[in-house]
C-alpha cells in the first residue's frame, strides 16, 4: 500500500506543480467554481424543461432526486469515515491558484481584538472522495441515459472539473478517481432503482400513464400529432376514464406530499441549521405553560411542549410539527381542489406551494406562522362547505373552531372575520346563511376561544393589547412622507421575492383579472375574499408603519388558490404560453428554496461562501459555538469559588444560551442558569417570571451582549466576485461598549472581557461582548 500512496502523491505533485502555468492558473480555478455557474445552471435547467420534452423533465427530476442525496449522504458519509486530509492541509508547498492565502496547513483564525473565540466549525478538509468528481460523473451518467449524445460535452466537462481539483491542490488523484467511479455508480444505481419502482408502482397506481410510458428511460416512439397529457389540455373523455385520470393526479399529489414530509424531517435530523431566536425563546415558554404570553397566544408553547415531549429537548423536537403541518396543509389543499376544481390543478397548487420560499421555510421553522396558516386554511375550507346550498350547521361549527384555534395561534386571525364580512358583501347568494344560526354559532365558538387570552391579559394589566398597539404605532398620527412610499415599495419587493416573482405576479394578475372574466364563479369570489383583503390591509398599512413580510402568510394560500383556478381555466381555453411560465416559476422557486435551506451550496457552485451579513441562515447558525464561548467564561468565573450564572441582553440570546448550554437546558424550567437582564417595564415574557435579583444574591455572573453581524462595505459584491478574503468585505467589528448602568448598580464590580468573534466555517457570524460581574447585591 505504501507504493500506492507514493504514486498518488507523486502524480498529484506532477499535476499540481510540474504542469503549473499561467494559463492553467486562470482556467482551473474557474473550472472548479465561478460566479457564472449558477446562472448557467439555471438557464440549462430551464432549457432542459422547456425544450427537452418528457425526457428533459424526467432527466431534470432524476438529477434532483439522485445528485443531492448522493452528495449529502454517500460522499459526505465516506468523507467523514475516511477522514483523509486534503493535500493543502497535509503537504507543504502545495499550490492553490484558487486561494488568495498561502498554501500549507490551514491557518488558525485570528480575531481582530486578540481575544479568544468560541470553537468554530473548521472548513471541510476531508478529501476522499471528491464530491465535485462524483457529482459531475453522476450527472454525466444520468444525462447519457436520457440523451445519448450528451456525453460529447458532459464527459469532457466532468474530466475538466475533476482535473481542476488536482491542479488547485484540493484532492489527490485517488480522490478524484474514487469520486468519478462512485458518482457514475450511484447515478446508474439510482436510475435502476427508480426504473424498477416505476415498473411495479406505475402499473398498479398509475395504469393510464404507465400504458403510455412503461419505462422511465426507454420511450416508445410518439406518433405525430398525438398529444401528451402534460403538453395539451386533455380531450373530452368518458366519465370513468376522466375519474381514473383524476385519481392518478391525486395519488401523485399524495406521493409528493409524503416525499416532502420525509425530506423535511431528514433535513431537520441532519442538524444543518439550529434554532432561531424566536424558536428558542418560545421553547422556554413551553417550560412554563400558561393561558397566554406577553406577545403571542398559547398554542405555539403547547405545540413545542408536545414536540419536545415526543422527541426530547432537541432541534428536531422543537420543530417536529412544522413539517407535519406542511404535510397536512398540502393534503387539505389537494383534497379541496380534487373535489371543487380537479386533482391536476390541486397537484400543481401543491407543487407551486413547495416552490414558494416563504411557504417552504414555514415547513421547517416552528414559529407561530405555520399554526396560523394551518387554521386559517382549515377555516377557509370548512367555511366553503358551510356556505353551500342546503349545508347543515356542522360545517359552521367546525369553521368557528378553526377560527378560534387560529386566534390562539396568532392574533392576525381576527382579520379573517373581516374577510367574511367582505365575502357577504360581494356575494349576495351567501347572505341567506345570515338568516340561519350557523354563522352566529361559529362566532360564539370563536369568541369562547379568546377566553384564555382575555383571562391572562386581565391578570397582567392587558399587556398584550399595549404591546400590539405599540407595534402598530397606534398612538402615532399618520403623516405622508417619502419614507412611507419607500416602505410600500420595499414591502412589494420583498414579498415578490419570498412568494416567487413569477407566482407573485401571476397571483396579483389573477386577483384582478378574474373580476372581468369570472366574477360569477363563487369559488373565485370566496377564495379572493379569504386572502386578498388581508394582503391589501397590510399593503396599505406600510404607508403608516413598518410591516414584516411574514404577516401576510395566511393570505398566500387563498391567493394562490385563485391564481391556480384562474390560470387553469385559461390553459383549458388554449393559452399555451402558461407552460413556459410555470416551468420558469418552478425552476426558480426550487433553486431559491434549495439555497435557503443550505446556503453553503453557493460555495460549491462559485467557489466561495456568502458573506454572513447576507447569508439567509445566519440567524440559525453558530449559536452552539456562541454558547460554548459563554459557558467557558462562566466556568472560569465559577472556578473562583462562587456559583456563577449568565445574564443576556436580548430575549433571543437568552433563549439560545438556555437551549445550547447543557446545564441551562436541563434546569430551565425550575432553576434557570440564564436570565434576561433586569427591566423596569414589560418588554418580553421574562418580565413575568422570577429574575436573578433576589434569587442569586451574592453570586457572580457573566453578562452577554450580542453586537450582531458586521455590516458589509460599499462595493463588496465586486470584491466577493474577485475572491478577496471575507474579512475585507465587512466593516470592522464594532468597538467595545461600556457596561450598562444597571449592572454597575446590581453588582459590586463589573469587568469588561472584551469582544469575541463567533466563527462558522471560517466566517464571523456573530460578535458578542462579555462582562464579568461579581457579587450580586
Where are each of the predicted segments found?
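Transmembrane-lumen/periplasm boundary regions of multi-pass, lipid-linked membrane glycan transferases
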Residues: 263-264, 271, 405, 416-545
Amino acid at each position: 500500500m505504501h507504493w500506492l500512496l507514493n504514486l498518488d502523491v507523486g502524480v498529484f505533485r506532477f499535476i499540481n506543480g510540474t504542469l503549473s502555468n499561467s494559463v492553467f492558473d486562470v482556467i482551473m480555478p474557474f473550472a472548479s467554481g465561478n460566479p457564472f455557474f449558477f446562472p448557467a445552471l439555471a438557464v440549462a435547467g430551464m432549457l432542459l424543461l422547456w425544450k427537452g420534452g418528457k425526457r428533459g423533465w424526467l432527466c431534470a427530476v432524476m438529477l434532483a432526486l439522485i445528485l443531492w442525496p448522493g452528495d449529502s449522504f454517500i460522499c459526505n458519509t465516506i468523507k467523514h469515515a475516511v477522514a483523509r486530509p486534503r493535500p493543502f492541509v497535509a503537504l507543504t508547498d502545495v499550490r492553490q491558484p484558487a486561494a488568495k492565502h498561502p498554501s500549507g496547513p490551514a491557518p488558525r483564525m485570528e480575531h481582530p481584538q486578540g481575544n479568544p473565540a468560541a470553537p468554530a466549525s473548521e472548513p471541510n478538509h476531508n478529501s476522499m472522495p471528491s464530491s465535485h468528481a462524483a457529482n459531475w460523473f453522476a450527472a454525466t451518467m444520468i444525462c447519457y441515459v436520457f440523451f445519448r449524445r450528451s456525453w460529447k460535452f458532459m464527459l469532457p466537462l466532468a474530466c475538466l472539473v475533476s482535473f481542476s481539483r488536482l491542479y488547485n491542490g484540493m484532492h489527490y488523484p485517488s480522490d478524484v478517481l474514487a469520486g468519478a467511479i462512485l458518482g457514475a455508480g450511484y447515478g446508474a444505481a439510482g436510475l435502476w432503482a427508480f426504473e424498477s419502482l416505476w415498473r411495479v408502482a406505475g402499473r398498479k397506481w398509475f395504469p393510464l400513464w404507465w400504458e403510455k410510458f412503461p419505462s422511465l428511460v426507454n420511450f416508445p416512439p410518439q406518433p405525430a400529432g398525438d398529444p401528451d397529457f402534460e403538453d395539451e389540455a386533455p380531450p373530452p373523455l368518458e366519465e370513468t376514464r376522466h375519474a381514473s385520470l383524476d385519481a392518478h393526479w391525486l395519488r401523485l399529489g399524495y406521493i409528493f406530499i409524503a416525499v416532502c414530509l420525509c425530506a423535511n424531517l431528514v433535513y431537520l435530523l441532519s442538524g444543518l441549521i439550529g434554532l432561531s431566536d424566536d424558536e428558542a425563546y418560545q421553547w422556554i415558554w413551553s417550560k412554563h405553560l400558561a393561558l397566554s404570553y406577553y406577545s403571542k397566544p398559547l398554542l405555539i408553547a403547547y405545540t413545542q411542549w408536545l414536540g419536545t415531549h415526543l422527541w426530547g429537548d432537541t432541534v428536531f423536537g422543537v420543530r417536529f410539527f412544522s413539517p407535519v403541518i406542511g404535510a397536512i396543509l398540502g393534503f387539505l389543499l389537494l383534497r379541496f381542489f380534487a373535489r371543487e376544481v380537479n386533482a391536476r390543478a390541486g397537484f400543481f397548487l401543491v407543487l407551486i406551494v413547495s416552490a414558494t420560499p416563504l411557504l417552504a421555510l414555514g415547513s421547517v421553522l416552528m414559529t407561530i406562522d405555520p399554526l396560523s396558516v394551518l387554521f386559517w386554511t382549515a377555516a377557509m375550507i370548512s367555511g366553503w362547505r358551510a356556505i353551500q346550498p342546503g349545508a347543515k350547521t356542522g360545517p359552521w361549527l367546525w369553521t368557528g373552531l378553526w377560527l378560534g384555534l387560529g386566534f390562539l395561534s396568532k392574533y392576525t386571525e381576527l382579520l379573517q372575520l373581516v374577510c367574511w364580512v367582505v365575502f357577504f358583501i360581494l356575494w349576495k347568494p351567501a347572505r341567506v346563511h345570515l338568516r340561519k344560526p350557523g354563522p352566529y354559532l361559529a362566532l360564539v365558538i370563536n369568541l369562547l376561544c379568546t377566553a384564555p387570552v382575555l383571562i391572562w391579559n386581565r391578570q397582567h394589566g392587558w399587556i398584550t393589547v399595549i404591546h400590539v398597539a405599540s407595534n402598530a404605532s397606534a398612538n402615532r398620527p399618520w403623516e405622508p412622507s417619502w419614507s412611507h412610499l419607500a416602505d410600500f415599495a420595499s414591502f412589494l419587493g420583498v414579498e415578490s421575492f419570498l412568494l416567487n416573482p413569477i407566482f407573485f405576479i401571476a397571483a396579483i394578475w389573477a386577483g384582478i383579472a378574474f373580476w372581468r372574466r369570472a366574477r360569477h364563479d363563487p369559488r373565485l369570489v370566496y377564495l379572493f375574499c379569504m386572502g386578498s383583503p388581508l394582503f391589501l390591509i397590510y399593503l396599505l398599512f406600510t404607508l403608516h408603519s413598518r410591516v414584516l413580510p411574514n404577516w401576510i402568510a395566511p393570505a398566500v394560500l387563498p391567493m394562490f388558490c385563485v391564481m391556480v383556478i384562474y390560470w387553469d381555466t385559461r390553459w383549458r381555453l388554449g393559452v399555451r404560453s402558461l407552460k413556459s411560465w410555470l416551468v420558469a416559476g418552478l425552476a426558480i422557486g426550487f433553486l431559491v428554496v434549495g439555497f435557503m435551506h443550505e446556503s453553503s451550496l453557493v460555495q460549491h457552485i462559485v467557489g466561495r461562501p456568502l458573506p454572513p451579513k447576507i447569508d439567509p441562515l445566519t440567524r440559525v447558525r453558530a449559536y452552539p459555538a456562541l454558547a460554548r464561548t459563554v459557558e467557558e467564561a462562566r466556568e472560569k468565573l465559577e472556578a473562583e469559588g462562587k456559583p456563577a450564572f449568565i445574564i443576556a441582553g436580548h430575549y433571543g440570546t437568552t433563549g439560545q444560551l438556555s437551549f445550547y448550554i447543557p446545564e441551562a437546558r436541563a434546569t430551565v424550567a425550575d432553576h434557570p442558569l440564564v436570565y434576561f437582564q433586569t427591566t423596569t417595564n414589560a418588554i418580553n415574557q421574562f418580565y413575568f417570571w422570577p429574575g436573578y435579583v433576589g434569587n442569586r444574591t451574592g453570586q457572580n455572573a457573566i453578562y452577554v451582549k450580542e453586537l450582531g453581524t458586521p455590516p458589509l462595505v460599499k462595493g463588496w459584491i465586486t470584491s466577493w466576485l474577485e475572491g478577496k478574503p471575507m474579512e475585507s468585505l465587512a466593516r470592522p467589528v464594532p468597538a467595545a461598549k461600556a457596561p450598562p448602568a444597571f449592572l454597575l448598580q446590581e453588582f459590586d464590580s463589573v469587568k469588561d472581557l472584551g469582544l469575541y468573534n463567533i466563527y462558522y466555517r471560517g466566517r464571523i457570524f456573530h460578535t458578542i461582548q462579555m462582562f464579568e460581574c461579581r457579587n450580586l447585591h
